[in-house]
Amino acid sequence: MLAGEYSALATELGGRVLNMDGSDGIINLLEIFKAGDNENISYTRHLSKLRKSYRFLKPEAESDEVNVYIEAVEALYGRYDLIPYARDAKRQKQITGLPAKSYPRYRDLLELVNEMISEILSKTSSEQEKVLMTEN
């Protein structure tokens, strides 16, 4: 596929072309886009996209590493109140279509991960063993 090959078609169909070099602004991979009939489906598909993106960026990553990444992302979304969770599609929390500033960025994820590491390191070795045993 050549660069710009589909630009004219996307524009003709009312779409928007984003240059991935960042010249049109920053692409936030943590922004949750509508990708299904309801917010739960969009959230699940978004997490799947993040999982695939991680594996693309680090193909040698073990499944445990990818799972820890997703768990950290979900904890971050919890902080930002971006988890739909309601089983009733009519009462789900809106997590898509929000202003860009409503979504965390990777710097926020890094901050959270550093907090999690500090918390683990501050525990005594027996407490750390308990944490590790319950996670496995």
Question: Predicted regions span which residues?
Answer:
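Conserved Walker A/P-loop ATP-binding site and its immediately adjacent core
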Residues: M1-Y6
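P-loop NTPase motor domains
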Residues: S7-G15, M20-G22, L29-N136
